[in-house]
C-alpha cells in the first residue's frame, strides 16, 4: 500500500543540472566499460547502484516530487531496475556475470529459470569463473543439491579454475554428503598444476575429514 501523498513540496528540491550531468557522465562511462567487458563486476555493481538508487528515489512516474514509495516498493523498484540492466547486458553473447545477477534476483520466484540462466552463464565462460560464482550463489541461497548438480554438469577439472572444485566440495559438505565431497576432491587430481593447488587441496581434505568425523560420532 502506497503512503498517502502530501500536497506540500516545502523543502523538496530537484537535482541540479550539474548533479544530473555528473550522474549521466558516470553512467555513460560505466556503460562503455560494460560494453567492452560485460563481465566487469565492479562496473556492473556501480551501475546497478546508480539505477537502483534512482528507481528507489523516484515515484511511479519517474518524478521524485510526485510521490513517496514505501520501503517494500522501493526495494521492488530497485530490483526491477537491476533486472532490466541485467537483461540488457545479458544479450551480449560474451556476458555471463549479468546472467548470474538475473539468477540471483529470480532464484526464489523462478527456480527453473534461475538454474537455466546459471547453466548458460557456465557455458559462456570456458575459464570456469562463471561456474564457480553460480555454484556459490546457489549455496548462498541454501540450494546445495542444485549447486552440486550445476557443478557436475559443467565442471572440467583439467581446464577450469580450481575454485570450481572448492565450491562443489563445499556444496557437498553443505548437503551433509562427505563421501560425495571426497569424490569431487579427487577430481582435482586432473588439474595440471598440482603445486599451485596444494594448499587448497589440504584445506578441503581437512574439511571433508571433519565432516566424516562428525557423521561418525553422531
Language-model features: where?
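TPR-adjacent "capping" and linker segments in tetratricopeptide-repeat scaffold/adaptor proteins
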Residues: 1-20, 30-35, 72, 85-92
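Solenoid-like repeat scaffolds
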Residues: 31-38, 86-91, 108, 119-125, ...
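Structural signature of tandem alpha-helical TPR/SEL1-like repeats
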Residues: 20-28, 56-84, 108-120, 142-150, ...
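Terminal, low-structured helical/coil segments at or just beyond the last alpha-helical repeat
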Residues: 3-5, 183-218
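Generic helix N-cap/helix-start motif at coil->alpha-helix transitions
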Residues: 4-12, 22-24, 39-42, 58-63, ...
Amino acid at each position: 500500500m502506497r503512503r498517502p501523498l502530501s500536497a506540500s513540496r516545502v523543502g523538496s528540491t530537484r537535482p541540479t543540472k550539474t548533479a544530473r550531468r555528473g550522474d549521466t557522465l558516470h553512467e555513460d562511462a560505466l556503460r562503455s566499460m560494460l560494453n567492452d567487458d560485460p563481465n566487469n563486476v565492479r562496473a556492473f555493481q556501480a551501475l546497478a547502484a546508480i539505477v537502483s538508487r534512482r528507481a528507489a528515489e523516484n515515484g511511479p512516474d519517474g518524478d521524485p516530487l510526485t510521490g513517496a514509495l514505501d520501503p517494500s516498493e522501493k526495494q521492488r523498484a530497485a530490483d526491477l531496475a537491476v533486472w532490466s540492466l541485467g537483461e540488457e547486458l545479458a544479450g551480449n553473447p560474451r556476458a555471463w556475470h549479468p546472467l548470474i545477477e538475473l539468477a540471483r534476483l529470480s532464484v526464489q520466484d523462478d527456480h527453473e529459470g534461475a538454474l537455466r540462466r546459471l547453466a548458460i552463464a557456465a557455458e559462456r565462460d570456458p575459464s570456469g569463473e562463471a561456474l564457480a560464482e553460480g555454484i556459490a550463489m546457489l549455496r548462498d541461497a541454501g540450494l546445495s543439491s542444485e549447486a552440486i548438480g550445476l557443478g557436475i554438469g559443467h565442471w572440467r577439472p583439467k581446464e577450469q579454475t580450481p575454485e570450481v572444485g572448492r565450491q562443489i566440495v563445499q556444496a557437498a559438505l553443505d548437503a551433509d554428503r562427505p563421501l560425495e565431497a571426497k569424490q569431487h576432491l579427487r577430481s582435482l587430481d586432473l588439474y595440471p598444476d598440482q603445486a599451485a593447488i596444494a594448499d587448497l587441496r589440504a584445506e578441503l581434505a581437512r574439511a571433508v575429514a571433519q565432516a566424516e568425523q562428525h557423521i561418525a560420532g553422531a
